[in-house]
């Protein structure tokens, strides 16, 4: 005979998987074209020179070069640009 009453069910106990958002390449880092620089929700960072934006607001490099983070304008928008790699640097 069971010595414990049946427990009720719960509607909790689930969580969504982490989305691995954030900065993937930092300032002055040399990266190849096509590399992801920032994975984000919305436009926390805006695309600057030589940077493209995917449909999920992911920023990626359009050319080989060095990552540069800046704030611009009256709204102090954070922008990410790529300074093209010429081959003579470093």
Swiss-Prot record:
Keyword Ribonucleoprotein: yes
InterPro entries (alphabetical): Ribosomal_bL27, Ribosomal_bL27_CS
A single GO molecular function term of this UniProt record: structural constituent of ribosome
Alphabetical UniProt keywords: Ribonucleoprotein, Ribosomal protein
Biological-process GO terms, alphabetical: translation
Matches recorded under SUPFAM superfamilies: Ribosomal L27 protein-like
Domain of life assignment: Bacteria
Pfam families documented for this protein: Ribosomal_L27
Keyword Transmembrane attached: no
Annotated region (Disordered), positions in chain: 1-21
GO CC aspect terms: cytosolic large ribosomal subunit
Protein family according to the UniProt entry: Belongs to the bacterial ribosomal protein bL27 family.
Protein name: Large ribosomal subunit protein bL27
Source organism (scientific name): Neisseria meningitidis serogroup B (strain ATCC BAA-335 / MC58)
């Amino acid at each position: 005979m069971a010595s414990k009453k049946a427990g009720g069910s719960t509607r909790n106990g689930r969580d969504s998987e982490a989305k691995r958002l954030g900065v993937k390449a930092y300032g002055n880092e040399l990266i190849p074209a096509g590399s992801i620089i920032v994975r984000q929700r919305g436009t926390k960072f805006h695309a600057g020179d030589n940077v493209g934006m995917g449909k999920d607001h992911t920023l990626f490099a359009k050319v080989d070069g060095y990552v540069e983070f800046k704030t611009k304008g009256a709204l102090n928008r954070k922008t990410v640009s790529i300074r093209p790699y010429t081959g003579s640097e470093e």
